[in-house]
Design a protein with these regions (language model features):
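Residue-level detector of anion-binding/catalytic polar loops
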Residues: 33, 118, 139
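Active-site phosphate-binding strand-loop segment of PLP-dependent enzymes
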Residues: 141, 147-175
């Protein structure tokens, strides 16, 4: 028999399951429920997107890309941002493309956080932020927004939580 307490790291053993999972379990047992959970679309992927994926596969584009993502995609993102906002980012040095948002968040936090660094996390927010901070040795610090502030961060809320150990602010949007 495997002793999971010895196999699994202490950092992972102390992680509590996400509370949203309880809602998923309840919703899965009900009919005609619209989930407002983790942002999964309730529609089928549009045909033009599926067709583009099929075409890419047919052209043999099935290999790993550069760690920072496809060069042509990074360039297109850079051009789109510049066109829509007037802000210029270098597609080679300042833009990366990940397989999903969670991976990008994880990479960013791992890159910036040292053991003991505090990370301010404005809530409500996506459930993975605090566990990733903890796994990186950081200290998640919740900054709760309320209905009274229309779930917006105020300067006072921020000042109240900032310390000498604060290294990062996670500011979810929309919030």
């Amino acid at each position: 028999m495997i002793d999971y307490d010895k196999l699994i790291s202490e950092k992972c053993r102390v992680m509590k399951p996400s509370g949203i999972r309880k809602f998923f379990d309840i919703a899965a047992q009900m009919d005609n429920v619209i989930s407002l959970g983790v942002g999964e679309p309730d529609f089928q992927t549009p045909w033009n997107v599926r067709q583009a994926a099929i075409t890419s596969l047919e052209k043999g584009k099935t290999k790993y890309t550069a760690n920072s993502g496809l060069a042509e995609l990074r360039k297109a993102i850079s051009e789109n941002i510049r066109k829509n906002t007037g802000i210029s980012y270098c597609d080679n040095d300042e833009i990366i493309v990940t397989v999903g948002g969670s991976e990008g968040i994880d990479i960013s936090i791992r890159t910036l956080i040292e053991s003991g660094d505090e990370v301010l996390i404005v809530e409500p927010c996506f459930v993975c932020y605090a566990p990733i901070v903890s796994l990186c040795g950081g200290v998640p610090v919740s900054v709760q927004t309320t209905e009274e502030t229309q779930f917006r961060l105020t300067p006072e809320m921020l000042r109240e939580k900032i310390t000498d150990k604060t290294k990062l602010l996670i500011l979810p949007f929309p919030n």
